[in-house]
């Protein structure tokens, strides 16, 4: 079992004495395998979906309940090392501009492999960009000059370049036209068919959920 959550709660506020914390997540129990799962996470805005997926790669930490990712317990313990967890569980944010930062597409996607000390980071970046369908003619382009759909693909390539076991995407199709949605979902399906990686995707698009999800998790007020 790659990910195991047991009675997990999460609150953004730091409670003062005699003031109970306001929990965004309440008693979450969840088990996720590292291979061949295509999970969609659905629920109304504010249900805690984005908070939950950020717990899965250690971007957020909690002391309420137990979060175990690849046999490592993630908590607010300052001594815990999260680098390996974040390599194994890749996270792509809803808005790619929050993830992109470098002056060219190739440099941006190469950053992750370099940061994790992987061999041949530029080649890994090229392979990831090819997987998501970014043409080589765009490699030296500033990522912020790309279309919204292209930016999202580059952000996904940045996560894929470190070869995570699990890929998490927060609303990857939001803002895309029907053709763009179809193309992106085909990329993800093809990726899973070739690699057996588990993909976890937040979505409000019920058509996408019905067509592509192998497993659906519904959240309601945490």
Each predicted region: which residue ranges?
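Helix-to-loop junction immediately C-terminal to a conserved catalytic motif
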Residues: 57
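Conserved ABC transporter NBD signature motif
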Residues: 65-76, 85
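Conserved ABC ATPase signature
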Residues: 142-146, 150
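Catalytic Walker B motif of ABC-type/P-loop ATPase nucleotide-binding domains
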Residues: 167-170
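H-loop/switch region of ABC-family ATPase nucleotide-binding domains
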Residues: 203-204
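Conserved ABC ATPase "signature" region
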Residues: 120-137
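Conserved catalytic motifs of ABC-family nucleotide-binding domains
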Residues: 163
